[in-house]
Regions:
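Conserved phosphate-donor/acceptor-positioning beta-strand/loop module used by diverse small-molecule
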Residues: 92-113
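Glycine-rich phosphate-binding loop used to anchor ATP phosphates in small-molecule kinases
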Residues: 49-96
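Conserved substrate/cofactor phosphate-moiety recognition/catalytic segment
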Residues: 11-66
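Small-molecule kinase domains that catalyze NTP-dependent phosphoryl transfer to phosphate-bearing small molecules
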Residues: 117-177
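The conserved Walker
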Residues: 4-5
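Hydrophobic anchor at the beta1->P-loop junction of P-loop NTPases
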Residues: 1
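Conserved nucleotide-binding/hydrolysis micro-motifs of P-loop NTPases
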Residues: 29-31, 102-107, 174-175
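Conserved glycine(s) of the Walker
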Residues: 8
Length: 191
């Protein structure tokens, strides 16, 4: 599953995982475990946890594929992920399908900022200076403008990412997204 942050890819990944009985490995879930286990004291350390989470995701996917299983990867994949994914695929010939959730940037940004204000969102994704929070230390909270959001994800190639067969989902309006229909496309692509 690929696409912009807050585009709906994780919700569909969980749905597809249950319907297909295929495990989903979500980089954000791994990051949250790393935030809670290791934490970070500055933005550089937080970035290292992001890199570690991506490496753990690829390592785990390789192990599942080694055992003859299938796997769903959930991440806002970017151009920089192509090399590592290509290596996994080279070592494990498999049917690769990208389900990319596209969304108008303005709407993705609105959802992104709304999600970061949700109390159920893990604070490690929002805090920039340190996690867990240290009493008496004011932490910077990410504050991205719509313009910087658009530039960041355009520059990184999130909206053009694709490996293998591509299924594009316009997720600008969640009400128009049909999970059963996407699942049917996915199943048809697996044949």
């Amino acid at each position: 599953m690929a696409g912009l942050p807050a585009s709906g890819k994780s919700s569909f990944a969980d749905y597809a995982s249950k319907e297909l009985s295929i495990p989903v490995i979500a980089k954000d879930d791994i990051k949250e475990k790393l935030f809670d286990t290791i934490g970070f004291k500055n933005y550089s350390e937080k970035t290292q946890l992001d890199i570690a989470a991506a490496n753990i995701m690829m390592f785990t996917a390789s192990k599942i594929l080694d055992a003859g299983g299938s796997v769903i990867l959930d991440n806002n994949f970017e151009d920089r992920n192509l090399e590592n994914l290509s290596k996994v695929i080279e070592n494990h010939p498999c049917n690769v399908i990208t389900v990319r959730f596209d969304c108008e940037m303005k709407e993705a940004y609105r959802r992104y900022t709304q999600r970061d204000k949700d109390p159920s969102r893990h604070p490690g994704h929002v805090l920039m200076t340190c996690y867990p929070p240290v009493e008496g230390v004011e932490d910077a909270v990410k504050d991205m403008t719509e313009q910087s959001f658009c530039e960041k994800y355009t520059r990184r190639g999130t909206m053009r990412f694709s490996m293998g067969k591509l299924i594009v989902v316009d997720a600008t309006d969640f009400k128009s997204v049909s999970y059963p229909q996407i699942l049917k496309q996915l199943k048809d692509s697996l044949v």
